[in-house]
Regions:
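N-terminal flexible segment immediately upstream of the FAD-binding catalytic core
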Residues: 1-70, 80-114, 141, 263-281
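Cytochrome P450 catalytic domain signature, combining two hallmark sequence patches
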Residues: 72-73, 133
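FAD-binding subdomain of flavoenzyme oxidoreductases
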Residues: 103-107, 116-298
């Protein structure tokens, strides 16, 4: 196990903890025991955080990001802690969205979508959706513990990815808190909506002005250098943004948030497409003469 040396909170950390306790409604955990509990996930790593915040709502996240930014620290969003690569541990402030921000907000069975908070566990969402014959498509092995926010961060998929693809293929909208504490909704925007947003002097406006320009500038590199595979969780999804622009579809930055591992903002709410639960399933054992022959049989 890779581990950091245990350390008592510094005076600056103590000051940060006191300010967090004074400004948010959720829990602020800073004891050695709490820090040790949150120093691990399903990976081999052990890294003690400065402290842990369990926000009760988006307002708590806004306050936390503003205070953490003022103290020149980092934020580590955390859901179910099922990461195998250490994405939910770090030396900054761990933001545990699974404790309170775990509700299913709205489910529309007719239009087949669901609004959930980022800490909602996939199995819980699927249990509710199953009453209407629906479910979330991608099915990672950690479904019983994985949070939707974690699935967004990791661009999760599962054993049936050939049928359902990645979670990026099912995201309709994401609410995100950016580093400056601003709350934005990344969903399909009409040209008029984009024009209205970009008139303002805000971080959101800068993103909508500069990212399309950046993608256009490096369009050829994105086309030629991104892997020509459909199951890819490496890097930022600039290729998906480029495809939106080339198709002339309503522009959204949601594909860029998916797979970003919490580095671009903290996801608070997600609108997901739902799929029908198969009425029948079966298992087939198919024999091939070689590994290459079996790979060639897989649809691309």
């Amino acid at each position: 196990m890779v581990s950091t040396v245990p350390a008592s909170p510094s005076p600056t950390t103590t000051a940060l903890v006191e300010q967090l306790m004074a400004h948010i409604q959720g829990d602020v955990l800073a004891s050695d025991l709490d820090r040790a509990i949150y120093s691990t996930d399903a990976s081999m790593y052990r890294v003690l955080p400065r402290c842990v915040v369990a926000p009760r709502d988006t307002a708590d996240i806004v306050q936390t990001l503003q205070l953490v930014h003022a103290h020149h620290s980092s934020i580590i969003p955390r859901g179910g802690g099922t990461s195998l690569s250490g994405q939910s541990v770090g030396t900054g402030v761990v933001l545990d969205l699974s404790k309170y921000m775990n509700r299913v907000l709205e489910l529309n069975a007719t239009k087949r979508w669901v609004w959930v908070e980022a800490g909602a566990i996939q199995a819980h969402v699927n249990n509710m959706a199953s009453q209407h014959g629906l479910k979330i498509g991608p099915d990672p092995s950690s479904t019983r513990m994985a949070s939707v926010g974690g699935m967004i961060g990791n661009n999760s998929t599962g054993a049936h990815s050939i049928l359902y693809g990645m979670i990026a293929d099912h995201v309709k909208a994401v609410e995100v808190v950016l580093w400056d504490g601003s709350v934005v909704m990344f969903d399909p925007k009409t040209p008029d909506e984009l024009e209205q947003i970009t008139q303002h002097d805000t971080l959101e406006a800068r993103l909508y002005r500069e990212i399309p320009s950046l993608v256009r500038t490096y369009a050829e590199d994105i086309r030629t250098r991104y892997p020509k595979v459909w199951r890819n969780v490496a890097g930022y999804n600039l290729d998906r943004v480029l495809k939106l622009m080339e198709r002339g579809e309503s522009f959204t930055l949601a594909p860029l948030i998916v797979g970003s591992e919490g580095t671009l903002g903290v996801v608070t709410r997600v609108k997901l497409n739902l799929v029908e639960i198969p009425k029948h399933t079966h298992l087939s054992v198919v024999h091939f003469n070689s590994l290459r022959e079996s790979m060639e049989a897989v649809p691309t």
